[in-house]
Amino acid sequence: MENKLRESKALGSTKIRFLVYTLLLVCAAIFALGCEEVQKTGTGGLGAAKAVDINDLTMQAYKIILDSLGDKDPAIRTNAIEVVAQTGQIKLIPKVQRLFADEFAPVRFAAALAIGDLEYSFGAGTVKELFKDEDSNVKLAACYAMVKLGSAKYLEVLRRAIGSSDQTVRANVAFLLGKCGDKEALKLLYWAMQDKDSADKVIYQAAESIAMLGDDRIYPKLWTMLLSVYADVRVCGIRSMGALGTREARNALLSMLDDKVVEVRLAAAEQLGRLRDTTGEPEVLDVFTSKLTAGLDERGRERVNVMTAMAIGRLATPSLIKHLPKLIEDESKAVRIAAARAVLESRMKN
């Protein structure tokens, strides 16, 4: 089916397969977490909402993230760590550091990234302890954190690791090189993208990382991803166009607002919001006004609501923010975390 997401060679993203719908919906990177399957729209949904003051939701959002850091589900813990980093919740970093001892490697991976993303210098000592971790991906995340904390020598470790035969390691390294802003790694990323032995997850992550580094030569590759018959590949291309951020990339994103799959439209709206363009607002509102989650199964509804919340966080318009109170009280933990992130992001913009 056109809207069925392809699972390519254990395709992954910044939240392992067991994460189900991680908040980033990254088609690339972390722990080979993949883009989940996309379903077509239904009818029925969340209904009308009144205008709200985003400040009224802030404490509720903070508590959701705080509680989620201690959740029994490792996917939820990972999602919460990501939100801490994405929204700059520096007060929660000590709790994130405790998760360096988590039994699940993806949680430790995300915790190391958070230290680097927030450039939390007080965490350097504990990050170095992760070099003893049994998981190679966690060690690489520790290298990323140290680079962000000023130890550029660890870049060389990451550059060498992209040649790994382990496709998950290779994809994660591509992701980390992009996050490091290492333009000297462009040649390596092109190699990884073009190598015949690279899995799809490596190819798509390398493409996104090249876009993150601002190399507009990647545009034709990203455009072909937008033309894919597979919705998950289109979503990956959309994320990469958002990372590239050129005028041509923005125009490409605008064209994806007409996609027949709701998740693809939401991804395009979110990435336009990333570029401070609110053109996609009607596509997000349509989830509520046309009740697009009605008729979906539980997982499909959760997925659409997570992506809706993510788009709201990027766009942060009053007409969208008013729907956050319902999303933040959704029965799904993943939706509540996504809504909490949207609240915190919206507050930063308003």
For the regions a language model picked out, list residue spans one by one.
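C-terminal motif of bacterial Sec signal peptides marking the signal peptidase cleavage site
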Residues: F31-G34
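Bacterial Sec signal peptide processing site at the extreme N-terminus
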Residues: E36-D53
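Amphipathic alpha-helical scaffolding segments comprising HEAT/armadillo-like alpha-solenoid repeats
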Residues: E37, L57-S68, Q89-A101, Y120-K132, ...
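Short inter-helical turns and helix N-cap capping residues of alpha-solenoid HEAT/ARM repeat scaffolds
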Residues: K72-D73, E103-F104, E134-D135, S165-D166, ...
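Solenoidal tandem-repeat scaffolds enriched in leucines and small polar residues
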Residues: S165-S240
